[in-house]
């Protein structure tokens, strides 16, 4: 009987770190019950770890808490990769092949690997995503098994500044190895976008605290990935600097305005000493700038809005009132909110929230990658205690009772002999004489 597998994933964002454990049965059923998070400020900027020691301590605490919840030891983790410098670069590899031999998967894998042979200035390749295949200059969805004299493969190289992955490696130096790195926006796209979304054309927009990631799909393939250095914290800081209030106050005001993207229709109320209409002016202006930058990604990807059927919106900032409507009006594409991965069952209602969609997607993706028999958690095992008597003494087994003998008949009193009777009489007489002398 195959044992269940446990998968541990970590997502390090600009405002918080989230760790979670999922359980995968031999039948493929995937569920998550345990999740831990820690908020932080300024230790991660634009998705890149700045204060390694602070984040290392947070990650260590999260894993220890998860170990206590599951009663086991975390042995390895899957770590999400995202950040400001993460983006895609298109690369092509051409190869002449023998026309009498069928193209194999091994050949495809070798050609794709060749795409990483050319170094990219100041960037590391963190993933490779195939985009299109051509056999004898004719595009094909799957070249394996086909015959031809040439093959061309177009791929997306997912690259980032070296510091992004370097600092992730540095913080995971306390004894728990990284099983694999997973590009977070690609994991989310794989898990929440439908086949129809990817085929007809869609744009996945993840609006976080300090970055906004845009992934564009068309004809079932990723065609563009970019990370913008803009997010929800920009709105907060505009209110903070414009109205001279503390950041925590600006954040609370932003969250409590009924319609922050429509200043003309905001209730004229004061929140923590701040005028709601005045704050809405700053929030609306900055949000308009972020939406304009998102729209620009279609131009950079050389894609028309007519080629994109929908925008799927996720991330902490995505829940702001009125954002979906304003984005749809500006970009002229219908917008909807993303949902948690359908293949993953969240058993704890307290953590079944959209704000954890990234770590849930990492767990779902890792469940596809983990090999049979592998696990990320060693559960504690307990055996019934064996008690020993002190001093090594072992009590003997009780012996069987002996066969009872028949009770003997009571013996009759023996008749006293003549000599014994005379002796008793003499003793009595002598005792009486002694007593008389004492009385005199």
Q: Can you name each region flagged by the protein language model?
A:
Residues 44-46, 222-225:
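Short small-residue beta-strand/loop micro-motif enriched in glycine and branched aliphatics
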Residues 146-147, 195-218, 224:
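Phosphate-binding/catalytic loop of phosphoryl-transfer enzymes
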């Amino acid at each position: 009987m195959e044992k269940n597998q446990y998968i541990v994933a970590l997502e390090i964002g600009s405002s918080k770190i989230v760790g979670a454990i999922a359980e995968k049965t031999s039948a493929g059923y995937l569920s998550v019950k345990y999740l831990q998070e820690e908020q932080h400020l300024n230790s991660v900027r634009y998705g890149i770890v700045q204060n390694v020691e602070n984040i290392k301590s947070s990650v260590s605490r999260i894993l220890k808490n998860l170990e206590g919840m599951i009663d086991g030891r975390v042995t390895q983790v899957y770590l999400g990769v995202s950040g400001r410098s993460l983006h895609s670069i298109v690369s092509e590899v051409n190869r002449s092949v023998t026309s009498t031999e069928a193209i194999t998967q091994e050949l495809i894998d070798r050609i794709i690997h060749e795409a990483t042979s050319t170094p990219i200035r100041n960037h590391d390749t963190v993933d490779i995503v195939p985009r299109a295949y051509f056999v004898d200059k004719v595009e094909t969805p799957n070249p394996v098994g086909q015959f031809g004299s040439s093959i061309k493969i177009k791929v997306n190289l997912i690259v980032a500044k070296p510091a992004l992955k370097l600092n992730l490696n540095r913080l995971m130096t306390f004894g728990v190895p990284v099983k694999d790195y997973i590009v977070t926006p690609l994991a989310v796209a794989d898990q929440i976008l439908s086949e129809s979304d990817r085929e007809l054309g869609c744009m996945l927009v993840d609006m976080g605290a300090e970055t906004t990631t845009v992934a564009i799909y068309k004809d079932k393939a990723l065609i563009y990935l970019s990370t913008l250095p803009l997010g929800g914290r920009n709105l907060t800081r505009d209110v903070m600097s414009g109205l001279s209030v503390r950041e925590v106050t600006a954040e609370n005001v932003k969250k409590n305005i009924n319609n922050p993207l429509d200043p003309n229709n905001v209730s004229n109320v004061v929140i923590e000493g701040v005028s709601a209409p005045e704050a809405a002016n700053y929030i609306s202006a900055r949000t308009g700038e972020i939406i304009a930058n998102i729209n620009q990604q279609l131009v950079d990807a050389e894609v028309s809005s007519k080629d994109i059927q929908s925008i799927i919106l996720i991330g902490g900032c995505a829940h702001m009132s009125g954002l979906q409507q304003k984005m749809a009006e500006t970009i002229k594409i219908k917008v909807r909110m993303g949902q948690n991965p359908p293949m993953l069952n969240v058993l704890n209602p307290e953590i079944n929230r959209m704000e954890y969609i990234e770590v849930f997607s990492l767990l779902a993706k890792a469940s596809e990658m983990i090999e049979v028999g592998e696990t990320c958690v060693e559960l504690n095992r307990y055996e019934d205690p064996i008690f020993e008597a002190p001093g090594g003494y072992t009590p003997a087994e009780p012996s069987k009772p002996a066969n009872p003998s028949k009770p003997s008949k009571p013996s009759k009193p023996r008749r006293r002999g003549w000599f014994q009777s005379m002796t008793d009489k003499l003793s009595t007489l002598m005792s009486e004489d002694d007593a008389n002398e004492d009385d005199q």
